[in-house]
Amino acid sequence: MATKKIRIRLKAYEHRILDAAAEKIVETAKRTNAEVSGPIPLPTDRSVYTVIRATHKYKDSREQFEMRTHKRLIDIIEPTQKTVDSLMKLDLPSGVNIEIKL
């Protein structure tokens, strides 16, 4: 029989909020006696945007902005119904994107 696994992928712009959300998920899963693998840090996406400072000329004067997307992966192996229910009721901080695959 194949083992069931829940894969949770978290994304956020701030790594402190992301780590706090990951810790809450791991604590909740361990409280219900589920085996947890993670949080595994995934590579950070970095987007750099270059903008000309002046409106009409002075192309040599530019400003760069960057956006970093931090990611974490958590696997919950052999989850019970109690684990799934407690994860659904979990209140996570705003600013964290959550993708769940069964």
UniProtKB/Swiss-Prot annotation:
Pfam families: Ribosomal_S10. GO terms for molecular function: structural constituent of ribosome; tRNA binding. Keywords: Ribonucleoprotein, Ribosomal protein. It comes from the Bacteria. GO terms for cellular component: ribonucleoprotein complex; ribosome. InterPro entries: Ribosomal_uS10, Ribosomal_uS10_CS, Ribosomal_uS10_dom, Ribosomal_uS10_dom_sf. One of its GO terms (biological process) is translation. NCBIfam families: PRK00596.1 (NF001861), rpsJ_bact (TIGR01049). Involved in the binding of tRNA to the ribosomes. Part of the 30S ribosomal subunit. Belongs to the universal ribosomal protein uS10 family. This is Small ribosomal subunit protein uS10. The lineage of its organism: Bacteria, Bacillati, Bacillota, Bacilli, Lactobacillales.
